């Protein structure tokens, strides 16, 4: 019997909604990246996008462990001399908490040809509401020890 190799249309995509309230950012990102890639499915193949859609709500209530809120820096550069800009994670969480969570999840995805396609399946919202109720997302519970 030959080995089964899934093709692009062979797998069905589900929608999951993850509540990020009091969930540690790294653990949330690892679980979301696993769902996005489809590694939880028996038909996983690294060369086929067989992952599920993931909606993360309450990104503004995610927990960042340790003193990273004050000390972890995020850098960006304008391309001009002296154009290095840096902010702490705490400053970014006040303005754009959805971007912080999205960057953490995207950082745990592979950097290859499928990465953009996988990133399109991720939706992050700062509040408790999302516009994807028509897709009937299934709540996904992250099991963790209380903070």
Curated annotation (Swiss-Prot):
Pfam families: Ribosomal_L13. One of its GO terms (molecular function) is mRNA binding. GO terms for cellular component: cytosolic large ribosomal subunit. This protein is one of the early assembly proteins of the 50S ribosomal subunit, although it is not seen to bind rRNA by itself. It is important during the early stages of 50S assembly. Belongs to the universal ribosomal protein uL13 family. Part of the 50S ribosomal subunit. This is Large ribosomal subunit protein uL13. It comes from Mycobacterium leprae (strain TN). The lineage of its organism: Bacteria, Bacillati, Actinomycetota, Actinomycetes, Mycobacteriales.
């Amino acid at each position: 019997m030959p080995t089964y190799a899934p093709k692009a249309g062979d797998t069905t995509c589900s929608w999951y909604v993850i509540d990020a309230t009091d969930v540690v950012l790294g653990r949330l990102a690892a679980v979301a990246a696993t769902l996005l890639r489809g590694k939880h499915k028996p038909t996983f193949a690294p060369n086929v996008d067989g992952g599920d859609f993931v909606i993360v709500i309450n990104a503004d209530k995610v927990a960042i462990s340790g003193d990273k809120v004050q000390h972890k820096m995020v850098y960006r550069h304008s391309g001009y001399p002296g154009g290095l800009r840096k902010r702490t994670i705490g400053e970014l969480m006040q303005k754009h908490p959805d971007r912080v969570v999205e960057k953490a999840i995207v950082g745990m995805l592979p950097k290859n040809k499928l990465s953009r396609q996988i990133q399109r399946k991720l939706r992050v919202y700062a509040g408790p509401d999302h516009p994807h109720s028509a897709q009937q997302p299934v709540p996904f519970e992250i099991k963790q020890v209380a903070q």
